[in-house]
Amino acid sequence: MNEETNNEFKKNLEKFKKMAKRGKETKMDKKPQIIVVGRSNVGKSTLVRLITKKDVRVGKKPGVTLKINKYDVGNFILVDLPGFGFMTGLEEKVQNKIKKEIVQYIEDNKDQIVGSIILIDVKAFPGIVERWDSKDEIPIDIEMFEFLEELELNPSIFINKMDKIKKNDQDKTLDKIVAIFGCPAPWRQWINDIITIGILKEGIGLNEVMVKINKNVNEYNRVKNKK
């Protein structure tokens, strides 16, 4: 990484850290938040663009999103967190700092976060898990899911890029994926509850995501209005 690129990454990282630390001070009107998390290049920015209908930078290279991006969608705030995993051009120690800041932001804002969406790539994910298993380590995707569950932040998993696997292999692959997240097969029993499948580049799966978001936001407002 050349000096100019390195300085730009450091600048973005400092902005990210400041936003994460300010957390509660930067909430828009104290509206409920929906966070979007996942590895780099799984379709996070595409999902954000579909929900917000705003021009969101979408890149083919991993690690396009390097800072927290918040979008006011009316009755809730959509928060696009940096992709974890491999990030183009970033040193490992910088990547680890960003991961810590993601966790810090979630912890600082847990009272406002009413739902969380973890995106995964249906074709790439099983191989990622196998590589981590070979090192006797838990993939960060699973750690994040368990972390969000522990905080009761209503995590759901969006399995993206369904067009990348053959139809004959879909049931077997999806059964394997839900089992990895601790949900017994068959995968269909979890559809539109914990699991949503789709092809975001074609907008497939967006309606199901919005149903979940609205359900979580409405429940938050119902409880809040009772107080």
From Swiss-Prot:
Domain of life: Archaea
Keyword tags: Cell cycle, Cell division, GTP-binding, Magnesium, Metal-binding, Nucleotide-binding, Septation
Positions that bind GTP: 38-45, 63-67, 80-83, 160-163, 197-199
Cofactor or coenzyme needed: Mg(2+)
Cited SUPFAM superfamilies: P-loop containing nucleoside triphosphate hydrolases (SSF52540)
Gene Ontology molecular functions: GTP binding; metal ion binding
GO BP annotations listed: cell division
Residues the entry annotates as binding Mg(2+): 45, 65
Coiled coil region boundaries: none
Name of one Pfam family that matches: MMR_HSR1
Residue ranges of domain EngB-type G in the record: 30-219
Role noted for this protein: Necessary for normal cell division and for the maintenance of normal septation.
NCBIfam families linked to this entry: PRK04213.1
Cross-referenced PANTHER family: ENGB-TYPE G DOMAIN-CONTAINING PROTEIN (PTHR11649:SF13), MSS1/TRME-RELATED GTP-BINDING PROTEIN (PTHR11649)
Family recorded in the similarity comment: Belongs to the TRAFAC class TrmE-Era-EngA-EngB-Septin-like GTPase superfamily. EngB GTPase family.
Stated name of the protein: Probable GTP-binding protein EngB
Organism ancestry: Archaea, Methanobacteriati, Methanobacteriota, Methanomada group, Methanococci
